[in-house]
Amino acid sequence: MGLRIKICGLRDPQQAIAIADLGATAIGFIAVRQSPRYVSPAQVAEIAQALQKTHPTVNRVGVFANATAEELEAYVAAGITSLQLHGDETLADSQRWRDRFPALELIKALRIRSTADLALAESFTDCVDTLLLDAYHPQMLGGTGATLDWQALQAFQPSRPWLLAGGLTPENITTALSQLHPAGIDLSSGVERSPGDKDLEKVTALFSSLARNSLLK
């Protein structure tokens, strides 16, 4: 399987289709009301329907933080195919959503401050399908533009696939992937003009950089 490429924080159906055209394997939707990239279930349904017609294999990821069952159900009904838990969800929370939504991919995101956080990440491998490592910020859950210490992550080899996030851009992606070998990458602020408004030139530059360095295989 090739590198998974998730572009997160979309709000516009045409941008979603254009980014899928460029080669994204997943589109992420922020279901956290405090986020400037927030989209309602109705907005997600509109984008999901458009993607289902043009790119049915592209994964549609709902990004949640300490969500209720009702919130998750609303976005699942809107057409998401993966649940990304990006808050302070515990192992018990993750197992509960695993049991409730067995057909959906379950991703647990962890905001990494130290190697102790990497050990915590590995503890989730029994109840989730995929891990995601993001940079820690005291006030923001994601989309901060801050990068991780890639060198410190080199020993991270969990038993589940993992995605690298945190301040990735078309300019630094090849450096990151020369040091690390995740199953996929997740970009948001590094390819946008403003929160929720993606810059298609930057997304194109991302794929060009990956292709030029033979990283799309």
Curated annotation (Swiss-Prot):
It comes from Synechococcus sp. (strain ATCC 27144 / PCC 6301 / SAUG 1402/1). NCBIfam families: PRK01222.1-4 (NF002298). This is N-(5'-phosphoribosyl)anthranilate isomerase. Its EC number is 5.3.1.24. GO terms for molecular function: phosphoribosylanthranilate isomerase activity. It catalyses: N-(5-phospho-beta-D-ribosyl)anthranilate = 1-(2-carboxyphenylamino)-1-deoxy-D-ribulose 5-phosphate. InterPro entries: Aldolase_TIM, PRAI_dom, RibuloseP-bd_barrel, TrpF_fam. GO terms for biological process: L-tryptophan biosynthetic process. Pfam families: PRAI. Coiled coil: none annotated. The keyword Lipid metabolism does not apply. The keyword Transcription does not apply. Pathway: Amino-acid biosynthesis; L-tryptophan biosynthesis; L-tryptophan from chorismate: step 3/5. Keywords: Amino-acid biosynthesis, Aromatic amino acid biosynthesis, Isomerase, Tryptophan biosynthesis. Belongs to the TrpF family.
